[in-house]
Amino acid sequence: MTEWWKKAVVYQIYPRSFYDTNGDGIGDLRGIMDKLDYLKTLGIDCIWISPVYDSPQDDNGYDIRDYRKIDKMFGTNEDMDRLLDEAHARGIKIVMDLVVNHTSDEHAWFVESRKSKDNPYRDFYFWKDPKPDGTPPNNWGSMFSGSAWEYDETTGQYYLHYFSKKQPDLNWENEKVRKEIYDMMKFWMDKGVDGWRMDVIGSISKFLDFPDYELPEGQKYGIGKYHANGPRLHAFIQEMNREVLSKYDCMTVGEAIGSDVEIARKYTGPDRHELNMIFNFEHMDVDTKPGSPAGKWALKPFDLVELKQILSRWQYELADTGWNALYFENHDQARVVSRWGNDTTYRAECAKAFATILHGLKGTPFIYQGEEIGMVNADLELEEYDDIEIRNAYQELVMENQIMSKDEFLTAVRKKGRDNARTPMQWDGSFNAGFTTGTPWLKVNSRYSEINVAKALQEPDSIFYYYQSLIKLRHSYDVFTDGRYELLMPDHPHLYVYTRENESEKLLVAANLSENTVSFDQPDDNWKLLLGNYEDTGTSTLFRPYEAAIYYLEK
């Protein structure tokens, strides 16, 4: 087996927002096929496609009704086969989303499971009796607000759902469940799928005594340590590796909620035979006020020193065992220029600066669609958001418990809401940004005439071509893959500076992640400037707002 993923740059596609070829307002698989040459021009090696399986779309496809069938909204199984062929013909690999913590409540297994207590599929899911007073079995909360338990009148029991009530959690303790999942994985990998991004994989093992959380007064439900990293998690993943993954030359990345560096080592240490890498969430919480009942919606100002500390800890701790998945954006996170940077005056410089920092790190970088043209957060009104997380949080935090005012909540959503990343891809300056000839499923960002692919391809100094250059550098110099990381100037409030070094090469990566001009000592003449985001980068002892550079030294 090769470790092709160590040199790869991955591009995430959220299909419903990527490109629509049939005018129904929803992106589709043929839309991805139509844009493969664009992605080849960008230079990426691999595409991760968010779920396209048959689904009622309660949580935009993360509620799966049939794992082996493509949803007609996106196309057909034949379209998927053709997409694999077309991508592979261009040297691009395809990774699919593996959503196996839960299914849809419309999946055949759950339809059977809820019929009776002695149904053969009953223990494919978690069913529990109510407490004597009729309330849920414990005080676990759903990630989408409310209780993690839903009462079902047919049998008088509750079923467990960490997400929406239409997403019942699978019982991984049941060997039949695991075999069904492994068979499904082989079905897709035998068609040519090159790997998996594993949705909330850290939650598949449950604490089977279902202990209550200790909660502060006034709080009804808890979300925390019992929602992830259960006792058999690593045994399950090792079994999956043994039964399926080890038989294919594939890439695996796990979404590991609640993981620290120690847990990451367990997932990704080569001798553990589990996954190649995981997405951690620690760095994405630098703008979240800890311990607030408002959760992710409790904002605090972006703190670069804290971001450097977190990213550096993950770089140091996984240096010799394991691997980092590098990202600032995905379908669950807002646009980085709007969230942590400047999306107006310095939008281009800012987008390039954050890209420089991320792509210089050790690990596999993930680019989310639109990130390569500097797309910005949505400018929607509350009623225009589609996301179930936003709608449920508004109900709980504003309407029911008055934890936030409507204005406070809208401010937080405009900063961090998932729909900021889900507005349609901006292809050109025409109506609906060239995404669809119909009515888009989510409103197109109003700045599409200023920010779009066609414009970016015409401008030699665009964000797109900067990303293209970064990807070429990662492919050209081994030090990007294997160089040891060292953080410099850890306490500087505006500069992020680090080195990467192997036996024969050294990089110096520097970025001013602020709107201030700051002093920065250029390295001596032995260093070569590989890339900078101002025309004359490297000629002054000052770093202008969001200025960034990568320098190279051959030892």
Curated annotation (Swiss-Prot):
Site, Transition state stabilizer: residue positions: 332
Signal peptide: none
Entry keyword set: Cytoplasm, Glycosidase, Hydrolase
Pfam families, sorted: Alpha-amylase, Malt_amylase_C
GO molecular function: alpha-amylase activity; oligo-1,6-glucosidase activity
Location in or out of the cell: Cytoplasm
UniProt xrefs under SUPFAM superfamilies: (Trans)glycosidases, Glycosyl hydrolase domain
Name this protein carries in UniProt: Oligo-1,6-glucosidase
Organism name: Heyndrickxia coagulans
